[in-house]
């Protein structure tokens, strides 16, 4: 007897009869025999339970950061995520309501994204925020193109520090190759920060000037206000990239004179997850000239025909809904679920929690830096947040291999990006870094070096 839900031969025979065939082999009669008669190098099929056991055996080879302490930062960090964040974003109202072509139907998702925008605006000190980009790198690249558009193409130069995160710099170069925007890099000084004198020589006719908080070496740029003033005096827009977990303990980029702020929202509420997905921050001043040139989607609050509060996608004429050549951006979606997770985490922390988070990271980074200075050279003096640059006399790859043997994941090798730094690596700490992990790292380094 045929059953609608269990595979059986009755259904198969019925379908074959309908198309006038007597066997499955006849379906593939047109394929030359030499291609279908050869034995495939495949194992015998397994039951679902057997597959489960095999997959579990493979997965057990992985090690979490709790089983193997990691100091590998350089843009991806282990942060603690409160349990309720995952629980809330897994609700079907969020998990399945990808912004549709009639977005006003999903009022809950639009409101959540509006709250994300509002929270980020408060953090970065600029009033207008979009509902996210793909990541920090794409946000920075879109900011560069935006500054060129704002100058109506008369200026096609974007100035960035040489010590911008190398992968973000790669994304920027990819984005700007087609529009033929010139990327000019500014050297760092003896303290590992932007060389202001070099900037003054290169800023002429620039559409925008970019700087990061903290920079790739983990250092806080002490002359960031001056960098902004130099940019504005040259008629360029000032773009600041920021790790938002620091914003509880430093001035907001908007207060430092930034016209555009970009960054990485996924440091809140989202796991490392092999580096993605992420959500890029994009914020601008309250200037319609800038707002109309923003990339991505903006969620606005208004009233419907009955006078009730409603959330909408606003200023959509900037987007890909119009002719492609006229659109400010052709990023076709945002990272909505990642942004909602970030919003939930930020709201849960509140102003006091955000400040305490920054203070703990700063304290842990300082301890890591102090202990690392006992075994290696710290080439740049200054205040570090998360990342610390360390230089060794011995090839770092050898050191790293030895650390792995001792169940410790070392720092990120930067010598391939900046050969002039020698055998250097970035070691990172966050609020999750434990004192005993750092002590174990130093003990291991003393053995290895």
Curated annotation (Swiss-Prot):
InterPro entries membership: GcvPA (IPR023010), GDC-P_N (IPR049315), GDC_P (IPR020581), PyrdxlP-dep_Trfase (IPR015424), PyrdxlP-dep_Trfase_major (IPR015421), PyrdxlP-dep_Trfase_small (IPR015422)
Q: Which GO terms describe its molecular function?
A: glycine dehydrogenase (decarboxylating) activity
Q: Does the keyword Oxidoreductase apply?
A: yes
* Entries under SUPFAM superfamilies matching the protein: PLP-dependent transferases
Enzyme Commission code(s) on record:
1.4.4.2
Give the residues annotated as coiled coil: none
Fetch the Pfam families from UniProt.
Answer: GDC-P
The reactions it catalyses are:
N(6)-[(R)-lipoyl]-L-lysyl-[glycine-cleavage complex H protein] + glycine + H(+) = N(6)-[(R)-S(8)-aminomethyldihydrolipoyl]-L-lysyl-[glycine-cleavage complex H protein] + CO2
Q: What class of enzyme is it?
A: oxidoreductase
Record-linked NCBIfam families: PRK00451.1
What HAMAP family does its record include? GcvPA (MF_00712)
Instruction: State the function annotated in the UniProt record.
Output: The glycine cleavage system catalyzes the degradation of glycine. The P protein binds the alpha-amino group of glycine through its pyridoxal phosphate cofactor; CO(2) is released and the remaining methylamine moiety is then transferred to the lipoamide cofactor of the H protein.
Please name the PANTHER family in this protein's record. Answer: GLYCINE CLEAVAGE SYSTEM P-PROTEIN (PTHR42806), GLYCINE DEHYDROGENASE (DECARBOXYLATING) (PTHR42806:SF1)
The subunit field of the Swiss-Prot or TrEMBL record says: The glycine cleavage system is composed of four proteins: P, T, L and H. In this organism, the P 'protein' is a heterodimer of two subunits.
What is the name attached to this protein's record? Probable glycine dehydrogenase (decarboxylating) subunit 1
Q: Which gene encodes it?
A: gcvPA
